[in-house]
C-alpha cells in the first residue's frame, strides 16, 4: 500500500517525463497520478480571459511573470542552466489554434535548494518577449485567503488526458491546520498554501503543475498567490490541492528574474 509520503513523491502535478526531479518511482500509464493536472470540475475559459496563462511543452502550466520570463513549478524542470528544449505556448485558450504564440526557452532557473519538498518554483526565460499582459505576484500574505481561481490545460478528471481548451475553476482557501490534518508532515506550511472544497469535486490535476492560483487584489487586478504543486489524487474529499505560497518566495523570485 502506498503511504502518503510515497504518494507525495508521485503526485507532483506534472506529466513531464524526466522533469519530476524528485520522483524515485516511474509511473506506468494508468497508474496513480503523476502528471500535469487539468482542472477538475472546471469550465472553459473565454479567449483573452487569462492572457498571462502559458502552456509549457513538458506538460506543465505557467504564467508570464514578465513578457520574457515564465513562472512555473520547480518540479517541472530538471535543473538550472541554459535550456532551449522547452516551448511556451501563449495567447490562446485552444492549444490547436493557429493564433497561438510559440516561443522557445533559452534558460531555466530552478529554485535554489529545491529537493522535492517545498520551494517548488522555477523561472524560464524565453528567446523573445511575448506581448501579452503579465501576472503580478503577491509579496504579502494579505491575499492568502478567500476564494482563488485556478486555470490549466491539465486533466479534467483523475487519470484523464490533457485538455485542448483552457479550463478554469474557483477553490476556497484551506487553513494550514486543516491541510496538515490531511497531509501531516508532508506539508510545509511556511512555504505552501492549500485550497479546495471539503467534499472535493474541484481541483487542479495532472498537467496543471506550475500554473498559477490567483485572485483579485484591492485594485481588482489579478494577483498570483500560488503555483500548482501537488496533492493526493485530484479533487478527492478532504485532500485539498497544495500550492507553492508565492508571497514567501516573492523576493527570491524577483531577484532571480533580475539575474536572468
From Swiss-Prot:
Disulfide topology: 60-76, 179-194, 205-234
A single MF term (Gene Ontology): serine-type endopeptidase activity
Enzyme class: hydrolase
Propeptide stretch(es), residue numbers: 35-38
Keyword Hydrolase appears in the UniProt entry: yes
Peptidase S1 domain residues: 39-258
UniProt keyword annotations, A-Z: Disulfide bond, Hydrolase, Protease, Serine protease, Signal, Zymogen
Active site: residue positions: 75, 120, 209
Keyword Protease attached: yes
Pfam families: Trypsin
Entry's Gene Ontology BP terms: proteolysis
Signal sequence segment: 1-34
Listed EC numbers: 3.4.21.-
Primary role: Involved in mycelium differentiation.
Protein family according to the UniProt entry: Belongs to the peptidase S1 family.
Identification of the protein by name: Trypsin-like protease
Native organism: Streptomyces exfoliatus (Streptomyces hydrogenans)
Upper taxonomic lineage: Bacteria, Bacillati, Actinomycetota, Actinomycetes, Kitasatosporales
Gene: tlp
Amino acid at each position: 500500500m502506498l503511504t502518503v509520503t510515497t504518494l507525495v513523491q508521485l503526485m507532483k502535478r506534472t506529466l513531464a517525463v524526466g522533469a519530476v526531479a524528485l520522483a524515485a518511482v516511474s509511473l506506468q500509464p494508468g497508474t496513480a497520478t503523476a502528471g500535469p493536472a487539468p482542472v477538475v470540475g472546471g469550465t472553459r475559459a473565454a479567449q483573452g480571459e487569462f492572457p498571462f496563462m502559458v502552456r509549457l511543452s513538458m506538460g506543465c502550466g505557467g504564467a508570464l511573470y514578465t513578457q520574457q520570463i515564465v513562472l512555473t513549478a520547480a518540479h517541472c524542470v530538471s535543473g538550472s542552466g541554459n535550456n532551449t528544449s522547452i516551448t511556451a505556448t501563449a495567447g490562446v485558450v485552444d492549444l490547436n489554434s493557429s493564433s497561438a504564440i510559440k516561443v522557445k526557452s533559452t534558460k531555466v532557473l530552478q529554485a535554489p535548494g529545491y529537493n522535492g519538498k517545498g520551494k517548488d518554483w522555477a523561472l524560464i526565460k524565453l528567446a523573445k518577449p511575448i506581448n501579452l499582459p503579465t501576472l503580478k505576484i503577491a509579496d504579502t500574505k494579505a491575499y492568502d485567503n478567500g476564494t482563488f481561481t485556478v486555470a490549466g490545460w491539465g486533466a479534467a478528471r483523475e487519470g484523464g488526458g490533457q485538455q485542448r481548451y483552457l479550463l478554469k475553476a474557483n477553490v476556497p482557501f484551506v487553513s494550514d491546520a486543516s491541510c496538515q490534518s490531511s497531509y501531516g508532515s508532508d506539508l510545509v506550511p511556511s512555504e505552501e498554501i492549500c485550497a479546495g472544497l471539503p467534499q472535493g469535486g474541484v481541483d487542479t490535476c495532472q498537467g496543471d503543475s506550475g500554473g498559477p492560483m490567483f485572485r483579485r487584489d484591492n485594485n481588482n487586478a489579478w494577483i498570483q498567490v500560488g503555483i500548482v504543486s501537488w496533492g493526493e489524487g485530484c479533487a478527492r474529499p478532504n485532500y485539498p490541492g497544495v500550492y507553492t505560497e508565492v508571497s514567501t518566495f516573492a523576493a527570491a523570485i524577483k531577484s532571480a528574474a533580475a539575474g536572468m
